[in-house]
Amino acid sequence: MVTLMAIAIAIASGKGGTGKTTISANLAVALAKFGKKVAVLDADIAMANLELIMGLEGKPVTLNDVLAGKADIKDAIYEGPEGVLVIPAGVSLEKFRRAKPEKLEEVLKAIHDLVEILIIDCPAGIGKETLIAISSADGLIVVVNPEISSISDALKIIAITKRLGTDIIGAIVNRVSNESTELGVKAIETILEVPVIGVVPEDPHVRKAAAFGTPLVIMYPDSPAAQAIMEIAAKLIGAKYEAQLKKKKESFISKFIKGLFGRR
């Protein structure tokens, strides 16, 4: 069991579309639900969207302002769901152009001092911001989809992380639909040579929650994906948690047949 306290965790992926930001946001809220003081920072200063998932879009001061030397980090911290401290990157192209990514390491250290757990939502791929975030973090979680192209891209992230000397916590396999073409957990662990610390199923509730700007674990806490994320959060801090999935409602026809013939 992985147990993490007072740590900065970089969450990265080899390519876009894995659901990395959704995992970052909801994992932060899930950890807060367990009573931890948590912050989540959007290090994807070019393609920021963490603020949309956390319901904090349009904030006047963002990480890009801080990286441009136009604001202090304390002014770019906002309280989000479950008391999670959120540092949005902002969506302004003008502010992005002024931002200096090399200041990110300094910012991360300042935020880390305020909380028990800092979640860093890295940009997809292996760009400058990702490398800075990973090197500044205590541990890495790589988010993958159960397909060979996603796993192949994740190998690059893992190799660079090892070279940077940052610990690798493990992988989260996201958007699993159990199709025959998908790679299984054992195969993924064999290829990546890191443990899979959680499997999050494909779940229509994820898009619904995002559309309302509310984290999944708050809006649909009983959904399969939310329960999987809560289990991952519990594993990270060494807490006990049992998934409480609602049973599907029995159809009218099923009830009718049982009533007609009885259970055998």
From Swiss-Prot:
**Entry's InterPro entries?**
CobQ/CobB/MinD/ParA_Nub-bd_dom, MinD_archaea, MinD_FleN, P-loop_NTPase, ParA/MinD_ATPase
One Pfam family for this entry, by name?
CbiA
Q: Which domain of life is it from?
A: Archaea
Q: Where does ATP bind?
A: K15, G16, G17, T18, G19, K20, T21, T22
Q: Which UniProt keywords apply?
A: ATP-binding, Nucleotide-binding
Give the family this protein belongs to, as stated in its UniProt record: Belongs to the ParA family. MinD subfamily.
NCBIfam families for this protein: minD_arch
What protein name does the entry list?
A: Uncharacterized ATP-binding protein MJ0547
Q: Which organism is it from?
A: Methanocaldococcus jannaschii (strain ATCC 43067 / DSM 2661 / JAL-1 / JCM 10045 / NBRC 100440) (Methanococcus jannaschii)
Q: Taxonomically, what lineage is the organism?
A: Archaea, Methanobacteriati, Methanobacteriota, Methanomada group, Methanococci
